[in-house]
Each structure stands twice: as structure tokens, then as C-alpha cells.
Amino acid sequence: MSYYRWDGDDLILDCHLQPKASSDEFAGLHGERLKIRLTAPPVEGKANAHLMAFLAKAFGIPKSNVSLVSGELNRQKRVRLQAPKKLPDLPGLARPA
């Protein structure tokens, strides 16, 4: 099992979120999930909104192309990225052949 899968041109990421971190960054793997540290607190959807903006910037797409599939109130999240323009340097992440 991998932390990502392709659904056509869309990328689905399984993430483990660490809110209230000292910086916004990808932090390797946490089990079968991509660990992401964010400075935003987990209050009133702030961490979710910050996650969408962080991923949009990292993958070179507008925020409107990032959607939360599951995990709205949980650290374990599944996110859909519609047609990412670029792929950050993440463990094993590659476009399908």
C-alpha cells in the first residue's frame, strides 16, 4: 500500500497532519501516510484550509483544484489534487507510466 494513487489525471494522497508545527513542510512518511506539518491550529477548519493552500502551492495548481475527500475532523486525511502540474520531491512519488 502506498500513500498515493492516481485516478486518471488526479492524484489522491493519504496524509497524516501535524497542526501547530514550527513550519509548513512535508515530513516523510508516517506509516502508510504522507506526514505534513502545518503551522495552522486545528481550530474551525484553519488547518484544513491551510493544508489545501500548502498542497496547491507545492503541486502548482489553484486551491480550487484541491479537495478534501475524507478526514475533515481528523489528522488522517485523504485529499484529491486535480491534474497536478508539478510533483514535489516526495518518497516514491511518480506519474503513472
Curated annotation (Swiss-Prot):
Gene Ontology cellular-component terms listed: cytoplasm
InterPro entries: DUF167, YggU-like_sf
Superkingdom to which the source organism belongs: Bacteria
SMART domains in the record: DUF167 (SM01152)
Family: Belongs to the UPF0235 family.
PANTHER family: UPF0235 PROTEIN C15ORF40 (PTHR13420:SF7)
Name this polypeptide is given: UPF0235 protein PFL_5841
Native source species: Pseudomonas fluorescens (strain ATCC BAA-477 / NRRL B-23932 / Pf-5)
Organism ancestry: Bacteria, Pseudomonadati, Pseudomonadota, Gammaproteobacteria, Pseudomonadales
